Amino acid sequence: MKTKSLKQSLSAFIMAVLFTVTASAQTKPNIYILATGGTIAGQGASQVSSGYKAGAISVDQMLSAVPQIMDIATIKGEQVAQIGSQDMNNEVWLKLAKRVNELLSQPDVDGIVITHGTDTQEETAYFLNLTVKSDKPVVLVGSMRPATAISADGPRNIYNAVACAIAPESKGKGVMVVMDDKIIGADDIAKTHTLWVSTFEDPNYGPLGIMYNGKPIYSRESVKRHTTKSEFDITNLTELPRVEVILSYSNATELFVDAAVKGGAKGIVVAGVGNGNMTTAMQNALAKEAKKGIAVVRSSRIMVGPTCQWDEVDDDALGFSASWFINPYRARVLLMLALTKTNDYKEIQRMFSEY
């Protein structure tokens, strides 16, 4: 009788453990990790070498370096692209945004983490901020050191990105970048250093928050339109209008304006001096093209501060729009999407004021 009783007790204990494990697995959030390549998937010649090949390892190899994420979430990985982010392009952006929207429309998907190279991460983050149609968390993550380096920053960043994506308080924040324990909003993000692991900043507004002990602590929210409040829909788009960024500098001429238009640009963003200013020769050339229907947006080479309307440049007279706090590279992203709807400079100006 004692043996039978012991067997029954042991059986009941095992069933209870299995039930607990199963219930625990079922309650863990479901996170998709979409990999695009970049330094975070890079492979160096040695652990101490600064040289490496971006996008050399697969999503499964990359995630195997961070087994701890399996403790906090149910993870599924997909390889969307495998490139250095200097080669990021509109085709991959559209593919990525459509896949994110497809996944987030599924009730059992709780969030998305996207691994990405840091060179153009701010552009991809902003594109997704304007085209994702969900309040569920979308977090981009990268690294400044390849996966094979001593003290690689990728694994910690990936863990923090997943931890941020599973947190209920991360919903409705817009697309975010999580690196070096900072949570950075896609509406105001810039890479500020070529080497430091703390390269990303929100230069105008400051970070949305920080990651601490695997938890997000938020200190602000974006007041700009994003995700579910965005008017842009890429569902049926297969390409985006061509927009070029040209630089103003001492003695700049109309050369790059003419080249952009001849190359098929429908819009031009000027990375101007100071408050979005440019040489008279460049301004005259752009005004001429604006009258022909080319959208012109003034931005600034300077990282901090707005490019304001109506200061030195009479935007209304010239048919220009001003980018306000959006830097030239993110301004290009917004202008491409704006041109899918209109080329009216006043309507484009509204968008640059709201996003």
PLM feature spans:
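Accessory alpha-helical/coil subdomains and C-terminal extensions
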Residues: K28, L34, S58, M62-I69, ...
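Bacterial N-terminal signal peptides
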Residues: S11-T22
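Bacterial N-terminal signal peptides that target proteins for export
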Residues: K2-F13
